[in-house]
Amino acid sequence: MRFLVLTGLSGAGKTTARGFLEDLGYFMVDNLPPRLWLPLLQEAAARGLARVGVVVDARALAFFQDLEEVLEALRPTVVYLEARPEVLLRRYNLTRRVHPLGAGNLMREIAEERRALAGLRGRAHLVVDTSELSPRGLKEALARFLGEEGGFLLRLVSFGFKWGPPQEADLVLDVRPLPNPHYDPALRPRTGLDPEVRRYVFSEAAEPYYRALLAVAGLAAEGARAEGRAFYTVAVGCTGGRHRSVAVAERLAEELSGRFAVEVVHRDVEREG
């Protein structure tokens, strides 16, 4: 699982960055106390979420006495956004927003916030000065740092129809017509990650059907990228989500990884029943 902390100066672009991270599939939470970060990650893992982010701003630091300890224990990726004081001042004047530490003197509030966040800045894996960056430039900087090819991510989610398709799916592929290892006693306890299960699923007779699925997934992802989408989710479903869907999602990832940045999530592989 990827865990990211997004922080930095107010007016430096955290709202833009948060939206872009959500487009990349991150589940984002604002100012969650650090003592709740581990339970959040545990719940996210149980729900098949592969990317989680927490936004931290200066207002919350007074309530985050355990922040250093939790950062040391969980070691998230920390992204810090900043800008020159005169740029932040200009942005506030344009939007007529009140600074979160609002006390009537904007330059003093900016300096106070910078001091308050100095510890987090020192821990940052990426510091971005957005003074001369457009929103698009900020997104591109984040995409490069996070290893997202062109800012576009193809997500492949295996699932079982008996548990319901993923709500976030843009495209659902039905692989139930493929050979089912469930009916082979030797293969039933295994998963689609097992080489023997994969050989069973991808028999010679199954190959035309798989190639058609590959073509559809590739065309759909290409179209989404051309439209400027940040990510596209292809859900791959079999009956229980343990054998065929897992095997197909893995093979799709292997064959499409040369064209897209790909992430694979096996939502139901450990479910029983």
From Swiss-Prot:
This entry's Gene Ontology molecular function terms read:
ATP binding; GTP binding
Keyword set, alphabetical order: ATP-binding, GTP-binding, Nucleotide-binding
InterPro entries according to UniProt:
P-loop_NTPase, RapZ-like, RapZ-like_N, RapZ_C
**Annotated residues for binding of GTP:** 57-60
Positions that bind ATP: 8-15
The record's Gene3D superfamilies line, in alphabetical order, gives:
P-loop containing nucleotide triphosphate hydrolases (3.40.50.300)
SUPFAM superfamilies tied to this protein: P-loop containing nucleoside triphosphate hydrolases
Does the record's keyword annotation contain Lyase?
Answer: no
Q: What does this protein do?
A: Displays ATPase and GTPase activities.
Name the HAMAP family for this protein: RapZ_like
Similarity-based family: Belongs to the RapZ-like family.
- NCBIfam families noted in UniProt: PRK05416.1 (NF003828)
Q: What is this protein called?
A: Nucleotide-binding protein TTHA0319
